[in-house]
Each structure stands twice: as C-alpha cells, then as structure tokens.
Amino acid sequence: MARKLLLEKAHIEGIRYYDVYRREGGYRSVEKALKTMTPEAIVEEVKKSGLRGRGGAGFPTGMKWSFLAKPEGVPRYVVCNADESEPGTFKDRYLMEFIPHLLIEGMILASFALGCKTSYIYIRGEYWWVKEILEQAITEAKNAGWLGKNILGSGFDCELYVQPGAGAYICGEETALLESLEGKRGNPRIKPPFPAVKGLWGCPTVVNNVETIAAVVPIVNDGGDEYAKIGVGKSTGTKLMSACGNLNKPGV
C-alpha cells in the first residue's frame, strides 16, 4: 500500500476539530519551527524536499519561495490558491473539508518562513460550506494561540483570512486571483512583474496551491531529506488524485 502523508489521519473521527487534531500531533511543526528553526532554515528544508507545486505547473516550491523579493519596510503576503475549478477535481476541497487545520498549520509555516504577517486563503465561491469550516478552524487556532500576536512567545505575528471568489474560472490563474482578492475584476495581469516582486496590492507575494501548502507540514516535521525519499525521480513526496466518474469507489 502506498504511504500516506496528508491523508494519514483523515479517517480519525473529529479530526476536523482543533482538540482532536492537536491530540493527534497537530501544530507540532509550528512548535518546532518557531522554537528551533529560522525562516531561512524552513525554506532550505522545502528546497531539499524537492516539493513541486501541486496545482499543475510543478514548479519547485523552495525555488519559488526563494524568489520572493524582500524590500525594506514593504509587507509580504502568502496567498493559498483554493480556487479549485477544474471539472472533476476535488482533492483540495477534501483536504479543507476534512482536515482544515492541516492547511492552517501549513499557512503558518509558510508565513513564518517568508516573513508574512498577513496571509489569505482564496477559495472558490461555490465552496461556501468549506469556507465556513475553514473560518471555524481559524477561530479555533487563534483561540489556542497559533494565530495572532506573538505566537508561542516567538515575536512572530500572523493573521489568516478566508476570501471567497465569485465563481470565475480564470481566477485560478494566480494574477487574476490577486486582482479578485484586491476587489477588482479577475483579469490576468501582464507578466513580468511576477507576484514574487509585485503581487497583492503591489507587494511581494507567494501564491501556492492547497496541497502544496499542506505538504510543508510533514516536511518540517520529518525533514526535507526524508520527504525526498518518497516518490519517483524528481517527483518527490506524495500526490493526491481525484478519482471520479463511472467508478465503484470515487474519492481522493
């Protein structure tokens, strides 16, 4: 049987809720990162892992993170692309619906690694019930001290928000997504400049897919080298697949 990473605990009753998620080892990676690692060390682990974008392009995630511009006095942002609009695709919805705290944990790690105090999950408008699940999970995480000011006494501040789209397919493209997130019509921007230099509100921004962000959690927990041992060739780690149609057992 193939090894599971992201869905390893999906079968546990109540894993959607903070108390159960925490009991099963949730947020352990954030503790490790804030207490024993530097932001640069996290980026290096992601590079060593060989993790590639899980949204379709397959660009090396660590390399993408290293491209983020860091001008003095200018805020930076992490945006999670949860605008899952391809027909028959629902793996990201599955993660958010059943293990929302895994995505939140990954967003905290990415935000710390990239020096971002405010981050966003841009979700497909049709996923209205998933938005409610995420917002409840964010409230739970904040009440437990994983979001907000001075997390774990580290001096790191992080706020996380969920923003629904309006159902436009084009907003799955990262620059159209950013336009929509800014409250504008979701038209793609001309590139360059790329979001890493001029993204959300003209500031340096990293846009990653739900599955990509979630994969950062096992990478920080176990190390990039361990993650890189899984997979084939340059395709390291695990990959979620949406199985649907005329099947006996559709699912992820």
Label every model-predicted segment.
Residues 1-48, 116-121:
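Iron-sulfur (Fe-S) cluster-binding modules
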Residues 33, 118-131, 135, 166-167:
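Conserved short loop/turn motifs at secondary-structure junctions
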Residues 99-113:
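Histidine-anchored nucleotide/phosphate-binding helix
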Residues 79-99, 114-117, 122, 131-132:
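A structural-propensity feature for long, helix-poor, extended segments
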Residues 47-68, 167-179, 183-185:
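Conserved phosphate/anionic-ligand binding catalytic regions in large, soluble enzymes, centered on
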Residues 10-11, 34-51, 154-164, 240-247:
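Short, hydrophobic/aliphatic alpha-helical segments
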Residues 131-252:
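Hydrophobic alpha-helical positions that pack around
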Residues 21-27, 80-92, 195-200, 241-248:
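Gly-rich Lys/Arg/Thr-decorated short loops/hinges at beta-loop-alpha junctions or inter-strand turns
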